[in-house]
């Protein structure tokens, strides 16, 4: 028996075309959500939206590109008006010792894992309903020491702190903020 916990709810899964984001998107769809998924690669995104089925829309968005985030906000507002759940799973992993990290590698990971998340939330905030939820994809690396991945660990610790700060900021707005750290 299907419970349809998200029937009539508008759910945006950023990074919903692969990995944990795709799994979450499928689960939201199975529970009846009006689903929006994003990703960088148009072909993959379209294929995964078809695979998910249901009421799934797909928009290209690279969270490291501020203009693409702004475009996403406009598209979501035009098609859906508001969102009930913002699930951000877009992220990257990179390992290596501190001596192997380049400035480009640092910027790429921080831009994808933390900066893009922050500015996606900032852009979507006016579209968040009351009540609504924001779920951020963290990592156990943001809580525990992980050898050979200092930049990744730092970015995911930032996600954890961002979630805690926003949870405190948004409590009076009816927006719940959580981080999931597999």
Language model features with spans:
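The beta1-alpha1 cofactor-binding region of Rossmann-like NAD(H)/NADP(H)-dependent oxidoreductases
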Residues: 61-72, 103
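Residue(s) in the substrate-gating loop at a strand-loop-helix junction
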Residues: 139
């Amino acid at each position: 028996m299907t419970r349809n916990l998200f029937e009539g709810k508008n759910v945006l899964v950023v990074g919903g075309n692969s990995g944990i984001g795709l799994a979450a998107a499928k689960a939201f769809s199975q529970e009846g959500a009006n689903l929006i998924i994003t990703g960088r690669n148009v072909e993959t995104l379209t294929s995964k939206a078809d695979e998910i089925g249901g009421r799934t829309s797909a928009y290209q968005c690279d969270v490291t590109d501020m203009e693409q985030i702004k475009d996403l906000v406009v598209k979501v507002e035009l098609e859906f008006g508001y969102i009930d759940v913002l699930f951000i799973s877009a992220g990257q992993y990179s390992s290596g010792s501190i001596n192997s990290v380049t400035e480009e590698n640092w910027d790429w990971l921080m831009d994808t894992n933390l900066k893009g998340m922050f500015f996606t939330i900032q852009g979507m905030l006016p579209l968040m309903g009351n009540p609504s939820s924001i779920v951020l994809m963290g990592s156990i690396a943001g809580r525990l020491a992980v050898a050979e991945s200092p930049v990744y660990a730092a970015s995911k610790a930032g996600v954890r702190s961002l979630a805690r700060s926003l949870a405190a900021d948004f409590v009076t707005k009816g927006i719940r903020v959580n981080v999931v750290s597999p």
